[in-house]
Every structure is written in C-alpha cells, then in structure tokens.
C-alpha cells in the first residue's frame, strides 16, 4: 500500500474536515465503505501490514492508512464524529491534553488508547561512514539553536563539525536530517534525546530546576542554519538521503533501520546500541511507546473496525515473533500485551491525559 495523502494535501483535507466532518451524533452517522486510520509515519508500516492481512482474511476492502504524522493524524481524528473523520489515529507518542480537549470540543468523547509496542529513535549514517559514539551533552551541543558560551551566557551555536562538539567524534560536518515539528518522532526526539543531553551540562541541569520553561525552550529549540534539516513525514526518504549524501546523519524510527540495514547503520548512545532487547528493556535511552487511538463512537458503524483492532493486537501480529516484529516493531512483554488486548476487547475509554 502507498501513502495515500501527500503532505501538501493534508491542509486541504483538514479544512474539509472542519467544514463537513463535525457531525457529532453517532446516531446520525452514515457508514463509510472501509476503515480509515491516519497519523504517525513510524506506525504507518505496521498499520499497512495489518491492513493488508485484515483485507486478506476478511475478504473486504483494505483499510485506508495515511501517513500524516502523529500531530496531523490526531488533528484529523479530533475533527468530529462521522464518515469524514478517521476511525483510528496512529501515534508515536501519547495523546496530549490539548489534543484530548480538542477531541472533546468536537464531540469525540469516547477514545480508546491502545499501546501496540515500542520503538527506538536511531541516529544513523550510510554504512561507509565512520563509527560515532554519542554520549553526554554531544547532541545538545551539536543541534541546539543556543548553547552556553565561554562566559556562561547563551550564544548562537557555532559548532560546525562533530569533532568540535567532542574530540572523540569524527571531524565531519554536522548535518542531521530529521522529523518536522508535526511529527510525533520530533516530540520524542526533543524529550528523549535533546533534553537529557542538555541536562548533562551542569548549568542547564540547574536551570531545569529553577526555570523549567526556560530550560525547555533552550533544550527543545533546534538549529535553523542547516545543521538540522526538517525532512518531512517519510522516514524512508531520510534513509535515501543518507545514501546520497555521505557524511550526513539521520534520525528515524528503529523499524526503518531494520528494513534498510543494508543501506544504513545506527550508532550508540551512552554506549548502548539500539536493538530489540535494549529498546524493550529501556536500556537504550532514546526509546518510546507507540499507540493507536480508536474512536469508540465509530464502533458498530464502520464495518470491521473491531476486527481490525483485534487483528492489530493479536499474538500473531503484535506478539513476540509476530509479523509486525518482522517490520521492526519491538513487542510488549507478554503480560503487558495481554493487558492491552483486554483493553482492546473491552474498548475501554481513556481518561484525560495530564500533560
């Protein structure tokens, strides 16, 4: 299956949803021909694989899966109830409190949160590049827009090579291709990579305690001078860019590393390489959970929605050795998977997020 919406079309789609998708009464819905899931580019290959299997076993229409980024998918999901809005939002982070409130405002009051597994964010290069070992404050000093200067004040980041950041790193130009602001992968990168790297600097660790807002601004604001390059929602495009631009670096989900390990290689963070085992255990520091959000008000209206969700969470799909592990999904521990399967069967409605 292909990515069914181009990035340029997503704004038009959302405007259309705002105009005609906010039929908030489940009783007034008309059934759509098939299931519609939209959101994270990282969850996209997992959702498309489940969609293919679901269509094959059910004999029905293949579910429509769109890669809009986590933020774009949740935005579309929260536009209302009815056939002009997605049944499922795919997300590489938890839904935010502000997004949950948008859903409620537009009549999407019954949302089921299901954790499907884990993913790690990898820092990768083409296979012929030298080995990097990132640690401590390396990522912050390379990619933050402002860093502490010699006198302790914050200055525009002057570092142009990795060896200027850390003499133990290669003397290659800092040029990192990564996810845009609409992506859940970007949110995860800022929280799991940039913020801890900033806290490795004593002055910033102190600032995190005394002025959290200022700390977050400094830790989460990436360079705009070409050292960091927003590369759209297609992680495969980043992989292709790395093969065409030797010396550059990319940030994307572990599943894309698994699919392209003949073209690119990952590098360690704090001495730990990303693997299924280190991501599942949390030993690899840039690890995260992935989710699907189901619009319960569409259950019983969109044909096959419950069946699709249960296929997604089945042992054969999301379990250890399941077909999604072949795509790079890091499975949940057995007990956690059983709990998520129970939530999916019961369609347990989530409570409001706190953040």
Q: Positions of the model-derived regions?
A:
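Bacterial Sec-type N-terminal signal peptides, specifically the leucine/valine-rich hydrophobic h-region
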Residues: 14-17
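Bacterial N-terminal signal peptides that target proteins for export
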Residues: 1-9
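Flexible loop/hinge segments at secondary-structure junctions
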Residues: 20-355
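Low-complexity, intrinsically disordered short peptide segments enriched in small/polar/basic residues
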Residues: 9-11, 32
């Amino acid at each position: 299956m292909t990515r069914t919406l181009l990035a340029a079309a997503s704004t038009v789609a959302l405007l259309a949803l705002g105009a005609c998708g906010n039929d908030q009464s489940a009783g007034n819905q008309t059934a759509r021909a098939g299931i519609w899931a939209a959101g994270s580019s990282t969850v996209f290959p997992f959702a498309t694989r489940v969609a293919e299997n679901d269509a094959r076993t059910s004999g029905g229409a293949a579910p429509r899966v769109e890669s809009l980024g986590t933020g774009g998918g949740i935005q579309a999901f929260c536009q209302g109830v009815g056939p002009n809005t997605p049944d499922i939002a795919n997300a590489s982070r938890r839904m935010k409190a502000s997004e949950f409130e948008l859903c409620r405002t537009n009549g999407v009051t019954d949302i089921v949160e299901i954790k499907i597994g884990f993913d790690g964010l990898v820092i990768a290069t083409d296979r012929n590049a030298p080995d990097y070992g990132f640690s401590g404050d390396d990522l912050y000093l390379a990619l933050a827009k402002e860093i502490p200067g010699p006198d302790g004040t914050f200055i525009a980041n002057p570092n142009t090579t990795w060896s200027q950041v850390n003499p133990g790193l290669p003397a290659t130009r800092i040029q990192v291709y990564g996810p845009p602001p609409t992506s859940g992968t970007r949110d995860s990168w800022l929280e799991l990579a940039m913020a801890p790297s900033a806290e490795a600097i004593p002055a910033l660790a102190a600032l995190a305690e005394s002025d959290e807002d200022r700390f977050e601004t400094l830790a989460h604001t990436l360079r705009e001078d070409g050292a960091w390059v927003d590369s759209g929602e297609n992680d495969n495009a980043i992989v292709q860019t790395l093969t065409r631009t030797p010396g550059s670096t990319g940030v994307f989900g572990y599943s894309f590393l698994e699919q392209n390990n003949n073209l690119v290689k990952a590098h360690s963070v704090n001495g730990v390489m990303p693997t299924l085992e280190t991501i599942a255990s949390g030993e690899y520091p840039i690890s995260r959970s992935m989710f699907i959000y189901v619009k319960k008000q569409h259950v019983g209206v969109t044909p096959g929605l419950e069946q699709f969700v249960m296929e997604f969470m089945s042992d054969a799909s999301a379990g250890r050795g399941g077909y999604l592990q072949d795509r790079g999904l890091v499975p949940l521990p057995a007990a956690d998977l059983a709990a998520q399967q129970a939530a999916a069967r019961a369609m347990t409605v989530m409570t409001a997020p706190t953040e």
